[in-house]
């Protein structure tokens, strides 16, 4: 992820090899479910994209049509992950699932709020959210709920399309990203996890690299779903 035409700095790009962490965690979760033998019908969708620069690059203010049919104005080309997630959520919804879970290294705003060790999550069903919080506590696998605060949704307003792919404020970026995705989940029960998927050396370990985050809590949650 270079950021596209809204290009990142060199420092901002330096760790982007870990930007596939959401997909990696989903693969890890699917393997856990298979190894444990939980009897659920699990469909794994991997949203894979390279965000780079070419003569075909998407431009700020371009308007694209989503799979769901709505038109999205590109406010920032570095907010590409939510575009492919939106189409995947729409695709998943077409089979009328009982639940959709997405995991993504989506926003720096979540890292600012939570640090790198605690993923944030959003959910459109309060009962499911409480069960996931309980599973997080039971497994010691941290997840922290942030609100789908509807009063921020007007930050996504567009004069030229149905909405933009990014909010017009420097504040609450993790929330507005989740509100964008919620437009595609609609009434399907849905959990969105915004994670770092990477750890740095700390007082407990000298290891630095990819990190499984939230999948133990989700495994426990699936057992009781």
Task: Label the predicted regions.
Residues 2-225:
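A generic structural signal for tightly packed, nonpolar segments enriched in small/aliphatic residues
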